[in-house]
Amino acid sequence: HDVRFKSYCGPDIRAWSAPVEDLSSWRDEGPIFTYPVGGQWDVMYAPDLVEVRRKDGSKEYYLYPHSRGRNREAMVAKGSRPDGPFTPLNMTDDGMGTVPGSTMGFDPSVYIEYVTDPKDPDYGIGFRAYGFWGFQRSSAGQLDQNTMYSLRPGNQAIGYFIPASSRYGVIRDPEGTEYPSVYPGQDLGSFNFFEAASIRKVGNKF
């Protein structure tokens, strides 16, 4: 884990766990994922891990460990436990890139929205999945629940989700960029997106 101790990240992802009743008591679960190709390892940047509860009561865990491929598309791996083992879902046969349709880019984050209304068209599958990603540009899109790495059929990615900044208060996106997900009248210079998207829901706010 510390073979690149002078760098931000190493060639594996390490997990820590704690009982929800005592978030001061953390346990090191050790390395849970690494990805060697041809005897070499890629660096694991800002990962995300989400739990999906299926309608039959089973749980699946989707790990978004880092970006691969010429277009910085995100690898997605699946496991039955949060500490692994994980199996990559969207890698090409040579392991060097991602398959067509892999939509998310640098430092991805995923949010799961559960559907409980029987009248909702997604009630049968039970959830919707949303992805967020980008480096010096914020993008987002609704994911296909069957793949968890491609866009949902009929949906397009939002190319500019929130404003990105080159330095505090200075927007780096092209002049005149529209942000369909930002409320009108907001100070666009206050968002300051750079990298490592991470979305959470607290109460009724995201």
Summary of predicted features, one role per range:
Residues H1-F206:
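Carbohydrate-active catalytic/glycan-binding domains of CAZyme proteins
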